[in-house]
């Protein structure tokens, strides 16, 4: 979860999302269905784990507690927090890690399991894995590129940026 630097609302986890003073940013359920569904499934799973009724992200009626992105959530989420339209955004770990690295004076993050520098996601977290393959024979450089993507060097780079490889 991405939050404003200093955590002015004292958010510590999913249980705080039911507080009346907390506004949540989520990706758009109609235009970014994959990320939206992943985030909602993660929130639902984490809420069940914590025994919290967190029905508002999936309620039919618009809710003032939820600020939805309009186009590209990975650009809009940090902006919504800085603009004061949201207090917390559920985003992929690698995105929150990037925001805290490029804007360390603006953002903090709350991992949903483990620590920021050593995440241990709870089983309820939806985790996306990256896959690569060739179409046909991959052309002149396809197999070399696939070998490169499968190398230890690239795994280290992925890991540094909070990404997992299948």
Give the residues covered by each predicted segment.
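Exported/periplasmic ABC-transporter solute-binding proteins
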Residues: 5-166
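Glycine/small-residue-rich loop that forms an oxyanion/phosphate-binding "nest" at active or ligand-binding sites
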Residues: 1-3
């Amino acid at each position: 979860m991405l939050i404003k630097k200093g955590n002015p609302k004292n958010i510590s986890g999913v249980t705080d999302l039911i507080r009346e003073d907390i506004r949540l940013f989520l990706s758009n359920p109609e235009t970014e269905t994959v990320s939206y569904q992943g985030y909602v499934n993660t929130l639902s799973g984490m809420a069940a784990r914590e025994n919290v009724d967190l029905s508002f992200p999936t309620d039919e009626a618009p809710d003032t507690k939820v600020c939805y992105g309009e186009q590209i959530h990975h650009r809009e989420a940090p902006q919504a927090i800085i603009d004061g339209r949201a207090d917390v955004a559920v985003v992929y770990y690698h995105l929150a890690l990037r925001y805290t690295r490029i804007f360390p004076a603006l953002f903090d993050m709350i991992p949903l399991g483990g620590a920021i520098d050593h995440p241990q996601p709870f089983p309820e977290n939806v985790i996306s894995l990256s896959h690569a393959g060739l179409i046909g024979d991959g052309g002149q450089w396809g197999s070399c590129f696939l070998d490169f993507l499968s190398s230890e060097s690239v795994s280290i780079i992925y890991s540094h940026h909070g990404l997992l490889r299948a």
